[in-house]
Amino acid sequence: MNEYVTRNNPAIRITMMPRDTNAHGTIFGGVILSYIDTAGAVEAIRSTGHERFVTIALREVVFHEPVFVGDMVSFYAKTLKVGNTSVTVRVAVEAERFGSHEKEVRVTEAEVIYVAVDEQRNKVKIAGEKHKKE
């Protein structure tokens, strides 16, 4: 179990497919980064109630273990900070390796910063939205 949410409630959960592999036969890191961005955005929306964000930074990305075809990968997210216009989210990535002795392995983690925008992509304040405090 991780420190973000219960095992049954990741922001997203994906089974990795052969189309996502790199030249070494493991899942391409860029695919994982894309899902980290998606999971973080889901959390930003859930924690603030604001529906439109853009990613401005992906920080402290650390790849601990490779991800393999067939792994069921869970992306757990937690809001770290809600500012006037931005939200900082921590995403932890765990892979469930079927047919292995290991149940769930922490494979990656990252911190992502989003900025709230309007329909014209102008920065807007989050004030007045619901702020989930944990």
Give residue spans per PLM region.
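A contiguous binding-surface segment within folded domains or other stable secondary-structure elements
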Residues: 42-81
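Hot-dog-fold acyl-thioester-processing enzymes
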Residues: 1-57, 115-134
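HotDog/MaoC-like acyl-thioester-processing domains
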Residues: 2-6, 10-12, 68-69, 80-134
